[in-house]
Structures are given as structure tokens and as C-alpha cells.
């Protein structure tokens, strides 16, 4: 009997774990059903994706989540489902999802492997492009490399480029994926330039306008939006070049397959709908051929 006790204890523990797993996996759906509330986090100051207040949130991602909520009301048979918006910071948004404080985040959240260590992601709904903003009167030593999409290669070019770029300072949004990207590029090019981490996109643009840094890297659409709204936007230049492209998706709790499936199904239906396509066109204009192809790739058949 004694010899079998460890085996029995192990089997009991295994059964208890197995019994607990389904409950955990269904946690978000159970919470949404029980509370009749979908709690949506968003990062203010990230226009055109998310902006405003909890009472009046706005932006493409926020409105997309509104359409998602309508679809989930039907899909989950929850006609009384309410949407509650909660402002978050970039630093705290993934933790809020992982801890169940919000059900997802309606902002431009890039889907990366590092972030997947903390949360899961829905199907993509947008492809974000990392761009840069500089002053229009920036010197050629800065404008030339950031404007060129396909640049010359070789030790002579690299030495010349680095010598010019080393004179300049750069900024990125703190806790964003741009930080790791910028550090990686600076290491690869052997740059000794200053890299500043700012608290908001608005601050990043402001210090470029004031000449405190030479360039600020962020999502290109966000930069264009801020340039259009800034009284001194005419002094700024946002080149067409994209330095990095990544899928944007809704962060979800890890290990919650039922909730992820529900969100993916609703999101696919929203993107395929007339309302979803009209929403995209209102914020970004009629999608080009490449954008249409990406939208089709993002969707899944039911």
C-alpha cells in the first residue's frame, strides 16, 4: 500500500489539474457572461487608433472593438452586453490583459513573439508600419539615409553613413516595440547616437519640433495624424519609407482558447462586413490592392 501512495498522489494531482484547466480556459467567457460586460482597454493619445476618455473613446481600433462587441452580442446570445472602456498605459496594457483586468486592448498593439510570452493575440486586423518624423530643415546627413528605401551596401557606405548618423539623436516611445528595434539597429550600425525614450507620441513630436532630438520613430499613421493636428506640423516631414512592418492584433489572455476563438470569429465577420469596410475607409481611405490582399489574409472562413 505504501508503495502505491506516491502514484496515487500523483494521479490525484493530475486529475485535479485536468479538472481545473477547462475552468481556467473558459474564464474570460464566463466572466463576460456573468457580468454582461465586455471590458475594453485602450491607450489614449494613440490616434488614429485610440484616443479620448472612458466616456468618449475614439479611434479606429476603438470603433472596431465597438463592432466586435455588437457581433459578440449576437454570437454569444448576450443582447444586454455592455461595453466598458478603461484607459491604460503602454507599459501596463499587456499586464492588464494577463491579469484579467480587461478583456482586450483596443489600440495599435503589435503582435510579437516577446509579447506572446505574456499574452495571446487574435487574428491580425491591421498591418502597422514603423515610420519616422524629422524637421523639414534637417541636414542631408539625416534626410538621405531615412529617405532611401534601398540603400547601397558595403564598408565604404557604412562608414560614411555611420559618421553622418552619429551626429544625430533619436527618440522612441517608452515600452513600445520601437525601443528594441532602435537599439538593435544602432548596434548593427555601430552607432553611438543618443536614444531618448518618451512618455507619449505627443512628446516625441514636440521634441522634434523644438529641435531637442533629430528624429522620432513611431507608427507612420500615428505620426501623420499628429503632424496634421500640430500647429507647427508644416515644419515636420514624415517620409514614405517604412522601417518595419508588423501585424496589429487584439491581445487576449493566454490559455483561453474558447475566448480566442470567439474573438477571432467575431473579428473575421466584422472585417468582412460592410460596416467594417466602411470603418476602415473612413479612417484610412479606400484600401489599395495590397491592403485588400492583407485584409483577405487576416480573415478566416467560418
Stretches with model-predicted labels:
Residues 41-46, 86-91, 100-112, 135-136, ...:
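Beta->alpha turn/N-cap motifs
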Amino acid at each position: 500500500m505504501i508503495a502505491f501512495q506516491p502514484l496515487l498522489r500523483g494521479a490525484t494531482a493530475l486529475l485535479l489539474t485536468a479538472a481545473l484547466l477547462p475552468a481556467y480556459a473558459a474564464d474570460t467567457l464566463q466572466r463576460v457572461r456573468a457580468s454582461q460586460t465586455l471590458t475594453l482597454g485602450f491607450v489614449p493619445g494613440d490616434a488614429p487608433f485610440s484616443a479620448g476618455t472612458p466616456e468618449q473613446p475614439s479611434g479606429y481600433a476603438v470603433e472596431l472593438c465597438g463592432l466586435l462587441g455588437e457581433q459578440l452580442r449576437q454570437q454569444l446570445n448576450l443582447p444586454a452586453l455592455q461595453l466598458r472602456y478603461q484607459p491604460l498605459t503602454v507599459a501596463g496594457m499587456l499586464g492588464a490583459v494577463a491579469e484579467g483586468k480587461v478583456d482586450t486592448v483596443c489600440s495599435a498593439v503589435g503582435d510579437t513573439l516577446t509579447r506572446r510570452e505574456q499574452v495571446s493575440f487574435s487574428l491580425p486586423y491591421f498591418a502597422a508600419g514603423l515610420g519616422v518624423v524629422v524637421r523639414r530643415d534637417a541636414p542631408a546627413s539625416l534626410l538621405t539615409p531615412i529617405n532611401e528605401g534601398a540603400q547601397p551596401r558595403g564598408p565604404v557606405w557604412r562608414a560614411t553613413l555611420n559618421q553622418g548618423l552619429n551626429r544625430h539623436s533619436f527618440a522612441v516611445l517608452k515600452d513600445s516595440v520601437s525601443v528594441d528595434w532602435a537599439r538593435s539597429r544602432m548596434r548593427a550600425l555601430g552607432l553611438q547616437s543618443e536614444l531618448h525614450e518618451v512618455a507619449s507620441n505627443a512628446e516625441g513630436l514636440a521634441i522634434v519640433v523644438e529641435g531637442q532630438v533629430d528624429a522620432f520613430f513611431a507608427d507612420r499613421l500615428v505620426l501623420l495624424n499628429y503632424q496634421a493636428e500640430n500647429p507647427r506640423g508644416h515644419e515636420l516631414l514624415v517620409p514614405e519609407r517604412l522601417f518595419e512592418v508588423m501585424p496589429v492584433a487584439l491581445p487576449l489572455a493566454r490559455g483561453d482558447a474558447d475566448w480566442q476563438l470567439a474573438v477571432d470569429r467575431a473579428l473575421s465577420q466584422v472585417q468582412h462586413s460592410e460596416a467594417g469596410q466602411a470603418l476602415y475607409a473612413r479612417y484610412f481611405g479606400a484600401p489599395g490592392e495590397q491592403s485588400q490582399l492583407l485584409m483577405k489574409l487576416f480573415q478566416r472562413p467560418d
